[in-house]
A protein has these predicted regions:
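Glycine-rich helix-loop "coupling/hinge" segments at transmembrane-helix boundaries
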Residues: 135, 146-149, 161, 176-177, ...
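Transmembrane alpha-helix signature in integral membrane proteins
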Residues: 35, 83-115
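C-terminal transmembrane helix and the adjacent membrane-cytosol boundary/short C-terminal tail
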Residues: 163-164, 210-220, 259-295
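Membrane-water interface segments at the C-terminal ends of transmembrane alpha-helices
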Residues: 36-55, 90, 129-152, 162, ...
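Hydrophobic alpha-helical transmembrane segments of membrane transport/permease proteins
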Residues: 3-4, 8, 36, 40-79, ...
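Transmembrane alpha-helical segments of polytopic membrane transport and secretion proteins
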Residues: 1-39, 278-295
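Generic hydrophobic transmembrane alpha-helix motif, especially the helices
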Residues: 73, 77, 83, 107, ...
């Protein structure tokens, strides 16, 4: 699931004017729908910072498993906590983990990929072998090893997911950058005496940004799935901090009695992942020069 998206070699073009981009974007159904779903999740997380219908941390056993009502719009869970409040606070936890984890993967992955492409030789070989080694440890396995050392928690899931993001972004960056290094304008820059670092910053990185932006949306979706899985297994976000994965864990023993307790967090995860994937598809179509000319 974490393999990089397939995009043809980057084409050096002038940046698309912002007005042209947004005019085309608002006509692209995948981009609009994906953006709307993603903004819905982001808005839920932001709202939870200042308001929730009830405290997501307050336990009221007397109110457990209540059906939807005017007081509790989606009912309550087995601890008497308001479902809407848990979903809002869970969105905050999920986005926090996803943003930090993807930032870790992006920082190290892009840096290593650019270095491998610029230096070549033994430097490239070492970086790519390190990438292969890291790729052998999925997020769940990394979280288990980290939990054995420092204990389970949000930090454990962030580090584990972040490490798992690195090899994918390293490979994508290196492959995309190699295509740019072979182009005439880069060869001309080298002939003019520009160093590898300057060429990387001025020519290579700007020409692969669109590919990286699209891939980040895919990696963010994978991070949400990984965070939910780790929290469900008890390795990620710990009580009393709400998490969609933790909500699924709490609901598994009540599937026949109250199946909606599992449906709500499952739907939240599905909406988040679907929105990011649609957004990524839309950005790919809008930012790829070949696809842009075809539309």
């Amino acid at each position: 699931m974490s393999a990089p998206i397939t995009i043809d070699a980057p084409v050096a073009t002038r940046p698309m004017p912002a007005r042209t981009f947004w005019r085309r974007a608002l006509r692209h159904r995948s981009f609009v729908l994906g953006g709307a779903l993603s903004l819905l999740v982001l808005a839920s997380a932001l709202v939870s910072l200042v308001w929730t219908p009830w405290s997501p941390y307050e336990i009221d056993i007397a109110a457990k498993l209540r059906p939807p009502s005017a007081a509790h719009w989606l009912g309550t869970d087995s601890f008497g906590r308001d479902i809407v409040s848990l979903l809002l606070a869970g969105a905050r936890s999920t986005i926090m983990v996803g943003v930090i984890a993807v930032s870790i993967g992006l920082t190290f992955g892009v840096t290593l990929g650019l270095i491998a492409s610029a230096r070549r030789g033994w430097t490239e070989e070492i970086i790519m072998r390190f990438s292969d080694f890291t790729f052998a440890f999925p997020a769940v396995l990394s979280a288990i090893m980290l939990a054995a050392v420092v204990g389970p928690g949000m930090v454990t899931s962030i580090v584990a997911i972040g490490i798992f993001q690195i090899p994918t972004l390293t490979r994508l960056t290196r492959g995309s950058a190699n295509a740019i290094w072979a182009r005439e304008f880069v060869l001309a820059a080298r002939a003019a005496g520009k160093g590898r670092f300057r060429i990387t910053i001025e020519h290579v990185l700007p020409n692969i940004l669109s590919i990286l932006i699209v891939q980040v949306t895919i990696q963010f979706a994978l991070a949400i799935l990984a965070e939910a899985a780790l929290s469900y297994l008890g390795l990620g976000t710990q009580p009393p901090q709400p998490s969609w994965g933790r909500m699924l864990n709490d609901a598994q023993t009540l599937l026949f009695q109250s199946p909606m307790l599992a449906v709500y967090p499952g739907a939240a995860i599905a909406i988040s992942v679907l929105g990011l994937n649609l957004l990524g598809d839309g950005l790919r179509d809008l930012l790829d020069p070949r696809l842009a000319r075809e539309r």
